[in-house]
């Protein structure tokens, strides 16, 4: 009986240990299963999208690069296929000489938060609805260094998250019919746009930055850049401006780096009092034809500025600059040491000479 009892006890112990081990293994197995996400992002099969490529980035987001597509038809064919998911983060196409037109079928049902199509020198037309599948997701659209002459600006009001629109270095002519409640950054430099209508920004209530460097602008009407309550950065360099009227520009910055105005490389001779207001960051007027720095115009501006750049202007440096020479804290805000028309440097002028000559 004793032997049987010991045998039974041993049997019970073994069974219990097996059950405990199995249960523990089951628990461990369950925990491991929980570590496997049920909705893991998967790129389309490489053979289905070639020569496009797809990669999954941090945060389970997919980026698509279609720089090597060989035709408009091939791009549309790739995006006509069924993907595991149509939700992408970025579409990138660069240095492609085969794409000429993007149509409503080019990107199929795929959606993106950013689209960057750059240096595609044969791309001339973006047709209506080309990006419409991304109307609810697109935040940044960059179409840089192509040859675009046609773009559906009038559709941008339907893009409910669009913050950044850039079509720099293209062939856009005339001011676009653009309306958006979300757009904060509009970058159009190096397009032959011409003069900007005085009411151009009334349909862009949240615009913060506008860049139209080298846009064939010859005139800015009073009020053009004063009705945008959030405008902080304005670039109008390398145009044909010869003057600015009173009330032309008013920026709305909130610190020394938030409101900047660049109007370099124009033909501006003078600035009337009240032509520019609200600049707290950097004001650049290099390579113009400014001759005078009268106190009534420039003291209010300089007192609020972080930095003032006015290199390569034919400054007369006569009695009109005495107030500036006598204000070292304002003189220090001037970038570098501009040369006067007579050859002397502005910051090297002798205050004693001006006091004797001008008082």
Swiss-Prot record:
Subcellular location: Secreted
GO cellular component: extracellular region; membrane
Signal sequence interval, chain numbering: 1-39
InterPro entries assigned: LRR_dom_sf, Wnt_signaling_inhibitor
SUPFAM superfamilies membership: L domain-like (SSF52058)
Domain of life: Eukaryota
Gene3D superfamilies listed in its UniProt record: Ribonuclease Inhibitor
Keywords annotated in UniProt: Leucine-rich repeat, Repeat, Secreted, Signal
Disulfide-bond pairs as recorded: none
Residue windows of the LRR repeats: 135-158, 160-180, 181-203, 228-251, 255-278, 280-300, 302-325, 331-356
Note: The shrimp has luminous glands at the base of its antennae and legs, and ejects a cloud of brightly luminescent secretion from the base of its antennae upon stimulation.
Subunit structure and binding partners: Heterotetramer of a catalytic 19 kDa and a non-catalytic 35 kDa subunit.
Function: Non-catalytic subunit of oplophorus-luciferin 2-monooxygenase. May stabilize the active conformation of the catalytic subunit.
Protein name from the UniProt record: Oplophorus-luciferin 2-monooxygenase non-catalytic subunit
Organism of derivation: Oplophorus gracilirostris (Luminous shrimp)
Higher taxonomy: Eukaryota, Metazoa, Ecdysozoa, Arthropoda, Crustacea
